[in-house]
């Protein structure tokens, strides 16, 4: 475990409050909550982590209570990762953020709320669990979708969120780009044409991954959902006879990022509990909670326990293949970038 694991003398009850609630950060004077009987914590997260943190908040509350004697109430806020980052940067109060990718945390850093070096605060570049991108198709796979070529062919209805607001959508896009890059040996004109054809098949761009799942699962739209692996497995768990997962030949290692919001925790006096909240995500107990919720545990030994669930031999590129998030964002998703160039609104 990393050296920031602080066993503190204060604490928490297993009450987790969910929804998109949070209070605007007002910057009142610094205080210390370590001697309070109860402390509150707000975790601003991305769209499909509701179930994960519903489970995690319960075990963390128990852990904190045992370690410190203090009760903790954790409030959750969920939405598209990019949108959530913007909300925090603009004043939505968060003690911690657990977002879909490093770039979104950097946006909060750039607003002056998170200190430089946050990515090194916890193990694995502050990514306690990972995921990847898969296809969710209807039972029997009626459109015979096996790889990215099939997603881009005529007559296929695709559901994916908007990469302008959703972290998962950016992972989706980059996974498709990686496939096309391999297929066309780096010929960017052909790669862009492939991505354009794929997005011409998109029926609706929801703002976040959970909204896209709702469009596909509950509203019956589309033939294939480009999805976080965990979101696809949850859909099958809830509807076991209606959907199948297809693993593409090339996908991407999706690394959600976690960080303490320094400006907020120092004002609220919650740094100790906030730091432990994120640090405990690396505990064996929490790593199994991640696996049970279909995220790939960072701990390789615990990941092996889920070898019957996850394809551990999947061909994955990483964000480093795109020059890191700053470069990927600038080239593909910033205003005037490639996505704006190729996507035509219906």
How should each PLM-predicted stretch be described?
Residues 28-111, 121-122, 228:
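Early extracytoplasmic/lumenal segment of secretory-pathway proteins
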Residues 109-182:
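A conserved helix-loop-strand patch within extracytoplasmic ligand-binding domains
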Residues 134-136, 244, 257-259:
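Residues embedded in well-ordered beta-strands
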Residues 265-346:
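Extracellular/periplasmic juxtamembrane helices and adjacent flexible linkers that interface
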Residues 1-40:
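Short, low-complexity disordered leader/linker segments with a strong preference
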Residues 48-51, 81-84, 102-106, 140-143, ...:
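Solvent-exposed loop/turn segments at secondary-structure junctions
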Residues 91-97, 155-156, 218-227:
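Alpha-to-beta junction loops
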Residues 184-249:
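Ligand-binding pocket segment of bilobal, Venus flytrap-like solute-binding proteins
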């Amino acid at each position: 475990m990393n050296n920031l694991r602080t066993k503190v003398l204060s604490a928490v009850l297993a009450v987790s409050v969910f929804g998109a609630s949070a209070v605007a950060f007002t910057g009142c004077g610094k205080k210390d909550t370590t001697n309070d009987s109860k402390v509150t914590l707000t975790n601003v997260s991305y769209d499909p982590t509701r179930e994960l943190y519903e489970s995690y908040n319960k075990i963390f509350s128990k852990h904190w209570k045992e370690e410190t004697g203090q009760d903790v109430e954790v409030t959750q806020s969920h939405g598209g990762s990019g949108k959530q980052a913007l909300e925090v940067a603009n004043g939505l109060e968060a003690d911690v953020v657990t977002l879909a990718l490093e770039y979104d945390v950097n946006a909060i850093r750039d607003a002056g709320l998170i200190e430089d070096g946050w990515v090194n605060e916890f193990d694995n570049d502050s990514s306690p669990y990972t995921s990847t991108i898969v296809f969710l198709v209807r039972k029997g796979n009626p459109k015979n979708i096996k790889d990215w070529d099939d997603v881009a062919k005529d007559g296929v209805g695709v559901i994916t969120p908007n990469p302008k607001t959703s972290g998962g959508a950016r992972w989706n896009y980059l996974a498709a780009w990686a496939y096309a890059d391999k297929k066309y040996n780096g010929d960017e004109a052909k790669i862009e044409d492939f991505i354009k054809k794929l997005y011409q098949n998109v029926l609706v761009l929801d703002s976040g991954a959970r909204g896209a799942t709702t469009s596909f699962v509950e509203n019956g739209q589309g033939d294939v959902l480009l999805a976080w692996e965990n979101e696809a497995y949850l859909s099958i768990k809830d509807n076991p006879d209606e959907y199948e997962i297809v693993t593409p030949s090339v996908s991407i290692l999706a690394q959600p990022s976690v960080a303490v919001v320094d400006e907020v925790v120092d004002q609220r006096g919650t740094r100790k509990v906030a730091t432990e909240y994120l640090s405990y995500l690396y505990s064996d107990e929490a790593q199994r909670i991640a696996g049970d919720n279909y995220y790939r545990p960072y701990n390789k030994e615990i990941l092996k326990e889920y070898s019957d669930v996850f394809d551990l031999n999947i061909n994955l590129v990483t964000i480093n293949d795109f020059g890191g998030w700053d470069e990927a964002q600038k080239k593909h998703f910033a205003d005037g970038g490639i996505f704006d160039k190729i996507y035509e609104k219906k």
